[in-house]
Design a protein with these regions (language model features):
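Hydrolase active-site cap/lid region
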Residues: 1-49
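Long hydrophobic alpha-helices with heptad-repeat/coiled-coil character
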Residues: 1-17, 21, 135-174
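Short, solvent-exposed loop/turn and secondary-structure capping segments
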Residues: 15-19, 84-85, 117-118
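Glycine-rich, phosphate-binding/catalytic loops in enzymes
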Residues: 21-23, 89-92, 123-124
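Short C-terminal domain-edge/linker segments immediately following a structured domain
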Residues: 34-41, 102-106, 135-141
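Serine-hydrolase catalytic core
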Residues: 41-114, 149-172
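Catalytic histidine-centered segment of alpha/beta-hydrolase-like enzymes
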Residues: 111-146
């Protein structure tokens, strides 16, 4: 058994086609009409991606139900990069629909997109490489810092629990 941690991820492929063995997962499209601007001119891109669960976008959804390993979804509820909580919920729904129970979710209200190792600086906004402009990443500094400490502890515990005793590389099941 293996383990994967997904921190503020999307349940669909984004930006460019994803090639894996015989599969090609197309990228999820976006709607610039959902772009918002915050004070002082920072872009809010949270709702720019189209809904991966809409019928026309289902081909973009990653077939997570094929993963045989344990999954931990770490979610920031104030993620302004994209709607991490919604994407984790949809990934878990897909797992449930396929009879899978190999996942856990931990959620942090008021934490922003970049949940990194403890004591890394909080970045409420920054230049987004895909957008080329300053975008909001969300989060309140103190709550975000506390979330980083807790998430780091949980990730380490998760890996210790589910990777203990494994030796050698694991074969992908996708």
């Amino acid at each position: 058994m293996g383990a994967i941690v997904c921190i503020n991820g999307c349940n669909a492929n984004v930006l460019i086609p994803l090639h894996y063995k015989h599969m090609v997962i197309p990228p999820l499209t976006f709607s610039a009409k959902n772009l918002d601007t915050t004070k002082p001119g920072i872009l809010d891109v949270r709702d720019v991606l189209d809904d991966p669960m809409a019928k026309e976008n289902l081909a973009t959804v990653i077939p997570i139900e094929r993963a045989s390993c344990r999954l931990l979804f770490v979610v920031s509820e104030d993620d302004r990069n994209w709607n991490s909580a919604y994407y984790a919920e949809q990934a878990c729904n897909r797992l449930k629909e396929h009879g899978r129970t190999n996942y856990e979710v931990v959620s942090y209200p008021k934490a922003g997109h970049f949940l990194e190792v403890p004591y890394m600086p909080h970045h409420p906004s920054g230049i987004h490489p895909a957008v080329g402009k300053e975008v909001a990443f969300g989060g309140e500094p103190i709550v975000h810092a506390d979330a980083q400490v807790d998430a780091w502890r949980r990730v380490q515990e998760f890996f210790r629990k589910h990777l203990q005793g494994l030796s050698g590389p694991l074969k992908s099941s996708l």
